[in-house]
Regions:
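Internal alpha-helical transmembrane segments
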Residues: 2-83
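Residue-level signature of catalytic and energy-coupling elements of molecular machines
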Residues: 39, 78, 127-130, 171, ...
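Transmembrane alpha-helical segments of integral membrane proteins
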Residues: 177, 196, 200-215
Length: 247
């Protein structure tokens, strides 16, 4: 009896037994957004309080905060675009090589797949049937080979532009939080408001991080808050010292 192979059956060599569903450890848009907000928040809290510590005119703090937001967001977006583009091009190149290997050396690729499934506990006869059935569908065979040999799915390659846009927006949102008080106030009141907003946002980011990592929400949120407050205290202290020295 011939075996009809579907993508689910073809993946049997990698997941022969049902098991507990795990978190997506390779990422996703929501995960990237959370960490982008965290970067923007920490960066601009540090910058704004560092500048505010020198007690300049409120306009100087606003300008510094806006510059940090724009520069940081563009930097994050550019870095994400370059990184994602390079990864996508590399994957596409490797997929093209695998496609050519399947075309030129089908028997060799067939034996590789049989050997792989056998090494994972699939009976030799069943492994042979699966590999043979796969060879009848070139695209499915390519998908399985690239997933097994490269660890990627050709159909799940992300968009560099989308990744860059997400990084830009996430960083900008995080960086805007400690800057908001400086559009409506100045002096110590704005400093305190920036610290409070930064602290609340840090707790929210820490809670979101815990959702992705599976850690304790309280512990992760407190850790995120502690990091933000240490960074804020250090930069504010440096700004104050520089302001006193130059004043």
């Amino acid at each position: 009896m011939e075996l009809e192979v579907t993508p689910a059956i073809a993946a049997a060599g990698t997941a022969p037994v049902p098991h507990e569903r795990h978190r997506d450890v390779q990422g996703g848009a929501a995960r990237a957004a959370v960490f982008g907000v965290s970067d923007g928040l920490l960066t601009n809290v540090s910058l704004i309080l560092g500048v505010a510590g020198a007690h300049p005119a409120p306009g100087v703090v606003r300008l510094a905060g806006l510059a940090g937001l724009v520069a940081g967001a563009f930097s994050m977006a550019a870095g994400e675009y370059v990184s994602m583009s390079a990864q996508k091009e590399l994957i596409q190149r490797e997929v093209s090589i695998e496609r050519e290997e399947l075309r030129r050396h089908p028997e060799s690729e067939h034996r590789e797949l049989v050997t792989l499934y056998v090494s994972r506990g699939v009976p030799a006869e069943a492994a042979e049937q699966v590999a043979t059935a796969l060879s009848r569908d070139p695209e499915l065979a390519l998908e399985v080979h690239t997933r097994e040999e490269l660890g990627v799915n050709p159909g799940s390659i992300g968009s560099p532009r989308a990744a860059a846009s997400s990084s830009f927006g996430a960083f900008a949102v995080g960086a805007l939080v400690p800057l908001i008080p400086w559009f409506f106030g100045s002096g110590d009141a704005a400093v305190v408001a920036s610290i409070i907003l930064g602290a609340l946002a840090s707790l929210a980011v820490g809670t979101a991080v815990a959702v992705f990592t599976g850690r304790s929400r309280v512990r992760t949120a407190v850790r995120q808050l502690a990091i933000a407050m240490v960074v804020a205290a250090v930069t504010y202290g440096i700004g104050t010292a520089v302001g006193v020295h130059t004043g």
